[in-house]
Amino acid sequence: MEKPRGVRCTNGFSERELPRPGASPPAEKSRPPEAKGAQPADAWKAGRHRSEEENQVNLPKLAAAYSSILLSLGEDPQRQGLLKTPWRAATAMQYFTKGYQETISDVLNDAIFDEDHDEMVIVKDIDMFSMCEHHLVPFVGRVHIGYLPNKQVLGLSKLARIVEIYSRRLQVQERLTKQIAVAITEALQPAGVGVVIEATHMCMVMRGVQKMNSKTVTSTMLGVFREDPKTREEFLTLIRS
């Protein structure tokens, strides 16, 4: 049987040939200019930043970039232990940033319910994994979300899905906190929203100051959570309990 073009067998595994480092990459698709004044927190309204088709097209280029990184580190990408590493790393990075393929409208579809509940709703200790956009290393932690409904509630699991969409991107913790709060506010129009994130940043643990036990805490308070100290204190007390 004739092998597909662009595929070779190495150590019994079939893999695509990587472009050589330094080779000119294929022409990039032009992207429409972003609207002036658009803020990161407004991204929940936008369409997908990346499609599955783009993943497939860009995977060889991403793998070639990892191969070039290995060479630049003085390694041999062709040795047995690293032979498939560029492809594994490229696939992993696409997964770590899969939030670019999802939109809030996909998640919230049919999950907003009319409900005459006017007491605080809290989901806390939501595990979160993200990638620091400054060093491309992980930061991990937990997210606590509370909101005061205004005639509508959101399926509880959808709060965790919102966290997943925004955390699976290149991020800074401050922006991530705000994006989650703004998305919930825009979707539900509640009386208020509070979001607190506690995270450990590998860029502080593995490099730089190398502080193993440091945690970064960020918060965004909107509506009555910002305006009313008693509401804010109730939320902060409940997430600590």
UniProtKB/Swiss-Prot annotation:
Function field: May positively regulate nitric oxide synthesis in endothelial cells. May be involved in dopamine synthesis. May modify pain sensitivity and persistence.
PTM annotation: Phosphorylated.
Pfam family, one: GTP_cyclohydroI
Highest taxon of source: Eukaryota
Disordered: annotated segments: 1-56
Catalysed reactions, as listed in the record: GTP + H2O = 7,8-dihydroneopterin 3'-triphosphate + formate + H(+)
Site (Involved in pterin ring binding): 87, 96
InterPro entries attached to this UniProt entry: GTP-CH-I_C/QueF, GTP-CH-I_N, GTP_CycHdrlase_I, GTP_CycHdrlase_I_CS, GTP_CycHdrlase_I_dom
Name of the protein this chain belongs to: GTP cyclohydrolase 1
Taxonomic lineage of the native organism: Eukaryota, Metazoa, Chordata, Craniata, Vertebrata
UniProt-listed HAMAP family: FolE
PANTHER family: GTP CYCLOHYDROLASE 1, GTP CYCLOHYDROLASE I
Gene Ontology cellular component terms for the protein in this record: cytoplasmic vesicle; cytosol; nuclear membrane; nucleoplasm; protein-containing complex
Entry similarity comment: Belongs to the GTP cyclohydrolase I family.
Assembly mode: Toroid-shaped homodecamer, composed of two pentamers of five dimers. Interacts with AHSA1 and GCHFR/GFRP.
Pathway(s) annotated for this protein in UniProt: Cofactor biosynthesis; 7,8-dihydroneopterin triphosphate biosynthesis; 7,8-dihydroneopterin triphosphate from GTP: step 1/1
Notes on how activity is controlled: GTP shows a positive allosteric effect, and tetrahydrobiopterin inhibits the enzyme activity. Zinc is required for catalytic activity. Inhibited by Mg(2+).
Propeptide segments, given as residue ranges: 1-11
Record EC number: 3.5.4.16
Organism: Mus musculus (Mouse)
